[in-house]
């Protein structure tokens, strides 16, 4: 299906869109491109990289595997993946990579191998966090990456949570308190049909977000790359969630 999707969007891609950002809105169930702008522009994707980090980690680790954080300090793979997807934790990405067989370089190689497997020729990773300017892709290929990431129950469940809670003991008894706030918390609180969400930002990548939503009992993938401000990115996301349906 995704080879067909990438072919369709290449055929119908705009050739002269006067916009600095890249956009794709894609209906998964009908295999229909609803909207696209600069869908094949190769650009940095910042922390959207972490979707591939999560895929490679979930293919190798069990959620209760204990990974070395530093000498005599450990964290489970599940805890690190939660921090990775909710807080967009760069350190969690590095720990997941360093504990991989063969270390960090082997983990990054596995990320790029997975991109080849998914038929994403313009997608390249040089680190597990997305901080590097050469972690690049296109809006079209990010949409495909979101689809593949959504096949993992853990990614869907965790990345759609506005907050992750923990139980702490206080003088008034045990209470739930948020331990992680999602980087797209405002949108996740505002809309109850977001099934997966990941943001990204570096000075070179701009403000980025990708989501899978459910609308009219059909799944849609939204990708926005390269907006100059968080407010503009989120307002555009609101418009695309509210307006587009096929």
Model-derived regions, located:
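Intrinsically disordered, low-complexity boundary segments flanking structured domains
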Residues: 12, 53-56, 174-175, 183-184
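Sec-dependent N-terminal signal peptides
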Residues: 4-13
């Amino acid at each position: 299906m995704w080879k067909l999707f990438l072919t369709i969007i290449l055929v119908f891609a705009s050739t002269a869109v006067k916009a600095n950002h890249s956009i794709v809105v894609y209906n998964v169930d009908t295999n229909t491109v609803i909207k696209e702008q600069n869908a094949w522009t190769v650009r940095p994707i910042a922390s959207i990289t972490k979707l591939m980090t999560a895929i490679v980690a979930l293919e190798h680790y069990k959620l209760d595997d204990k990974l070395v954080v530093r000498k005599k300090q450990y964290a489970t793979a599940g805890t690190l993946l939660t921090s990775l997807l909710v807080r967009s934790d760069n350190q969690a990405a590095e720990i997941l990579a360093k504990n991989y067989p063969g270390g960090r370089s082997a983990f990054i190689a596995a990320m790029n191998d997975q991109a080849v497997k998914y038929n994403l020729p313009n997608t390249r990773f040089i680190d597990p966090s997305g901080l590097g300017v050469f972690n690049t892709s296109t809006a079209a290929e990010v949409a495909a990456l979101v689809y593949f990431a959504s096949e993992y129950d853990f990614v869907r469940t965790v990345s759609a949570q506005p907050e992750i809670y923990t139980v702490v003991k206080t003088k008034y008894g045990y209470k739930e308190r948020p331990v992680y706030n999602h980087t797209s918390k405002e949108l996740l609180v505002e809309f109850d049909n977001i099934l997966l969400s990941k943001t990204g930002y570096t000075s070179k990548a701009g403000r980025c977000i990708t989501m899978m939503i459910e609308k009219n009992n059909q799944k849609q993938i939204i990708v926005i790359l390269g907006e100059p401000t968080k407010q503009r990115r989120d307002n555009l996301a609101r418009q695309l969630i509210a307006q587009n349906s096929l």
